[in-house]
């Protein structure tokens, strides 16, 4: 069962994540971070960047692996996740760009039709993560339908990094990043699978707003199901879900989650 932390706002959630990761880097200078795009992690990255600066933490050895990438977008496209990760994480934290990887790096705009190259990219990415020693902390957002990464409802809970077709709702949701033109949104992606994500030693999922309330309810208190991919976190030995009041509004046991978090010993961390 994941630990549920209910916070006032995104800034408070960001501070919790930032402290967790900063302490990890101090203890393990070559820590491997799992990175995600989207709006949910932004406050977390900002909080971590501030701690790194204020405490003069050496991040030169830190490594990173992103969750996913569109297929067909060149790395230089402003909405490629390669560009987004470098803009929101690598530059603010001062990470070494050569040590931060995105599943589509080896593709760099390769079209979906180039099956020989596209099909090999997923397994190669999983091997790269394993060669780095695995991911220490993986940050996650969640879609309104319970997807994590680009693992849409129906994704195998044992899946590795592979090519997926984007759900129409996901393309509609992401059109805001493409001048509100769904025709510009790629139709396919390469994403870490649920099986890959579950290998990370610590998962931290962030969710904010009433629009995420149903997905959080299904993730935490619903049954384990491929139709809510995030529900796989119920089976992880060290998962933390940080939500604001609105995202937690449908949780039946939220009073217990608050009590458990406020009464845990400080040395346990998250």
Curated annotation (Swiss-Prot):
<keyword id="KW-0378">Hydrolase</keyword>
<dbReference type="GO" id="GO:0005737">
    <property type="term" value="C:cytoplasm"/>
</dbReference>
<protein>
    <recommendedName>
        <fullName>Glucosamine-6-phosphate deaminase</fullName>
        <ecNumber>3.5.99.6</ecNumber>
    </recommendedName>
</protein>
<comment type="function">
    <text>Catalyzes the reversible isomerization-deamination of glucosamine 6-phosphate (GlcN6P) to form fructose 6-phosphate (Fru6P) and ammonium ion.</text>
</comment>
<keyword id="KW-0119">Carbohydrate metabolism</keyword>
<dbReference type="GO" id="GO:0042802">
    <property type="term" value="F:identical protein binding"/>
</dbReference>
<dbReference type="InterPro" id="IPR018321">
    <property type="entry name" value="Glucosamine6P_isomerase_CS"/>
</dbReference>
<dbReference type="Pfam" id="PF01182">
    <property type="entry name" value="Glucosamine_iso"/>
</dbReference>
<dbReference type="GO" id="GO:0006043">
    <property type="term" value="P:glucosamine catabolic process"/>
</dbReference>
<dbReference type="GO" id="GO:0006046">
    <property type="term" value="P:N-acetylglucosamine catabolic process"/>
</dbReference>
<feature type="active site" description="Proton acceptor; for enolization step">
    <location>
        <position position="68"/>
    </location>
</feature>
<dbReference type="InterPro" id="IPR006148">
    <property type="entry name" value="Glc/Gal-6P_isomerase"/>
</dbReference>
<comment type="similarity">
    <text>Belongs to the glucosamine/galactosamine-6-phosphate isomerase family. NagB subfamily.</text>
</comment>
<dbReference type="GO" id="GO:0005975">
    <property type="term" value="P:carbohydrate metabolic process"/>
</dbReference>
<dbReference type="GO" id="GO:0019262">
    <property type="term" value="P:N-acetylneuraminate catabolic process"/>
</dbReference>
<dbReference type="GO" id="GO:0004342">
    <property type="term" value="F:glucosamine-6-phosphate deaminase activity"/>
</dbReference>
<feature type="active site" description="For ring-opening step">
    <location>
        <position position="152"/>
    </location>
</feature>
<dbReference type="InterPro" id="IPR037171">
    <property type="entry name" value="NagB/RpiA_transferase-like"/>
</dbReference>
<feature type="active site" description="Proton acceptor; for ring-opening step">
    <location>
        <position position="147"/>
    </location>
</feature>
<dbReference type="InterPro" id="IPR004547">
    <property type="entry name" value="Glucosamine6P_isomerase"/>
</dbReference>
<comment type="pathway">
    <text>Amino-sugar metabolism; N-acetylneuraminate degradation; D-fructose 6-phosphate from N-acetylneuraminate: step 5/5.</text>
</comment>
<feature type="active site" description="For ring-opening step">
    <location>
        <position position="145"/>
    </location>
</feature>
